Amino acid sequence: MGLNIRGRSFLTLLDFTPEEINYLIDLAVEFKRLKNNGVEHKWLSDKQIVLLFEKTSTRTRCAFEVGARDLGMGVTFLDSGSSQMGKKESLADTAKVLGRMFDGIEYRGFKQSVVEDLAKYSGVPVWNGLTDQFHPTQMLADIMTAREEFGDMRGRKLTFFGDARNNVANSLMVVCAKLGMHFCACGPKELMPEDWLIEKCQAVAAETGAVLEFTDDVAVGARDCDVLYTDIWLSMGEPAELWEKRIKLLRPYQVNKEVMAMAKPTAIFEHCLPSFHDRETTVGEDIYQKFGLEAMEVTDDVFLGHQARQFQEAENRMHTIKAVMAATLGAEF
């Protein structure tokens, strides 16, 4: 397919050109076609990878494990309870050891500096499965899903509703800037992206023709929107008093049928999951009992409606992650 990114780490999309990002998505589309047609593609059967998880995961872990096995690779999983990294062994030492045993390393955890240091010291490709700052593999799936709907994404408007300073919103702003899209962050003024990242993305947008917009007005965010996107409002383990504050702050930015109606009739809804769209979880029921909310960031009718694409998006995590691993490990296409 033309581009060569063999040996590179995948830490943030700020490190990749628009052509490289589209190349990875094109490759993911091809992997999806192969898998759907039952065509074997064990092109990396001589490779071994390790997955380092300091945070729990469903989609990211499954996508890496299934994708790696589809490519013929061996997979080792280490969580915080089965690794000495940062406890009895320094991060640098762990990285050097893993780099001698494995061909690639995935990391899902907290600090962006950890995944960057793994790449610095290991000597092998390192893939960011999520940090507090960025979630780049999610972005490839998000754009792939939108491309399956609209084709070329240049000029298309994607609006993130809610906490626009979180890792998903950060990464959406980056990928939209890279691909010449119209990105809108719609949320409370105190939860807008950090200035340093806005400045980086504005510099990218000046080259690609992207538009970056920031508003606390839901109608402005939804107007002419092609992709309406949201994420959960709170994380597990946070104190109840923080829940109350965040729910009060973010409740006006819930994606519901009224918000969807303000967007283009052809608009789609995306969500990185998990979602609190009903009371069918312990957390959902707890929120209902404490605050009387049947749903949080998105209502059940939108989540289950004809414009929703979050499960297609979740499947595409596997295809896009497979593309990242294959391209950086040097599979022959």
Per-region residue spans from a language model:
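Rossmann-like adenosine-cofactor binding region
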Residues: Q202-T299
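Anion-binding alpha/beta catalytic cores of soluble intermediary-metabolism enzymes, centered on
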Residues: A95-K96, D103-V175, H271
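Positively charged, low-complexity intrinsically disordered leader regions
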Residues: M1-C62, V66, F134
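C-terminal helix-to-coil terminal segments
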Residues: D286-F333
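Short, structured coil segments at secondary-structure junctions
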Residues: L71, M101, Y121-S122, L179, ...
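Glycine-rich phosphate/diphosphate-binding loop of Rossmann-like nucleotide-binding domains
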Residues: F53-V66, E148-D231, M236-E238
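Active-site cofactor/substrate anionic-group-binding motifs, chiefly glycine-
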Residues: Q48-M101
